[in-house]
Design a protein with these regions (language model features):
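Flexible glycine-/small-residue-enriched beta->alpha junction loops
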Residues: 72-78, 93
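Glycine-rich phosphate-binding loop of actin/hexokinase-like ATP-binding domains
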Residues: 47-73, 115, 119-154, 191-237
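Residue-level signal for inorganic ion chemistry
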Residues: 13, 38, 65, 104, ...
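A generic secondary-structure signal
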Residues: 23-31, 103, 107, 211
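Gly/Ser/Thr-rich active-site cleft segment
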Residues: 84-204
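Residues that line or immediately flank small-molecule/substrate-binding pockets and catalytic motifs
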Residues: 42, 64, 175
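Alpha-helix C-cap/termination motif
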Residues: 31, 78, 107, 111, ...
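N-terminal glycine/serine-rich phosphate-binding loop of ATP-dependent small-molecule kinases
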Residues: 1-58, 74, 86, 170, ...
Length: 237
């Protein structure tokens, strides 16, 4: 996965990621391996914009792109930092989806203005495999758009960036079925109607779920792009 620099901005090549997935599925089919299901997780915050016809409007911005520098301060002039944090419980960082979307809104971005749906990266890849649009809870939580108490998209924050819940896919939690491989993907890969299941779409969430702890009294340290330490709780602290 490599950044693409075009016109002074950094993007992800989601079609390359899709091609890599297809190549992997072809290899599995060639080996005759049995697949019970497919799940996709990725890094957080980044997203794609889809038009009314379901097609990609633009390659997704990469969170390392500098277009969101100063974005939190601009947003907090309308809704306070404490209110945003109180609803979401997410660390304020300029590249969170909330601030990416608000930056696009303030700049009258043509892709956002034409967008019918917003899909986070793992959900976009699942959509390309199944034709089904969903918004998985853990990946949506990285956006700073999910209310940690209701575990749903927060209407006030959506309104602030000019969106509604209808602009996102069906809200799902890990373990729910998204769909099955489309006939096109089946034909390309040589696989059958394999189910695609929502996992913790945020890769850190999937990593924590896989911690081989024997009881609930444990802490985790997940090291990837950076290191995150925490504990599992039944409700927000």
């Amino acid at each position: 996965n490599h950044l693409i620099e075009v016109g002074g901005h950094f993007y992800w090549d989601i079609y390359a990621l899709y091609r890599h997935i297809i190549d992997g599925l072809k290899l599995v089919a060639h080996r005759g391996e049995s697949i019970a299901s497919i799940g996709i997780d990725t890094w957080g915050v980044d997203f794609v914009l889809l038009g009314k016809d379901g097609n990609l409007l633009r390659q997704p911005y990469a969170y390392r792109d500098p277009h969101t520098v100063g974005a939190p301060e601009a947003f907090f002039s309308r809704i306070s930092r404490s209110e945003v944090y109180g609803k979401t419980g997410i660390q304020v960082m300029n590249f969170n989806s909330l601030f990416q979307l608000d930056t696009l809104r303030r700049n009258h971005d043509s892709a956002l203005e034409a967008a019918d749906k917003v899909l986070f990266m793992p959900d976009a890849l699942s959509y390309m495999l199944t034709g089904k649009m969903v918004t998985e809870y853990t990946i949506a939580s990285t956006a700073q758009l999910v209310n940690a108490h209701t575990q749903r998209l927060e209407p006030e924050l959506l309104k602030a960036v000019g969106l509604q819940e209808e602009n996102f896919g069906r809200f799902v939690f890990p373990g729910e079925k998204i769909g099955t491989l489309t006939e096109e993907v089946q034909k390309i890969t040589g696989l059958g109607a394999i189910p695609v299941i929502a996992v913790a779409g945020h890769d850190t969430g999937s990593a924590v779920a896989a911690v081989p702890a024997l009881d609930r009294n444990f802490a985790y340290l997940s090291s990837g792009t950076w290191s995150l330490m925490g504990v599992e709780t039944d409700a927000p602290v």
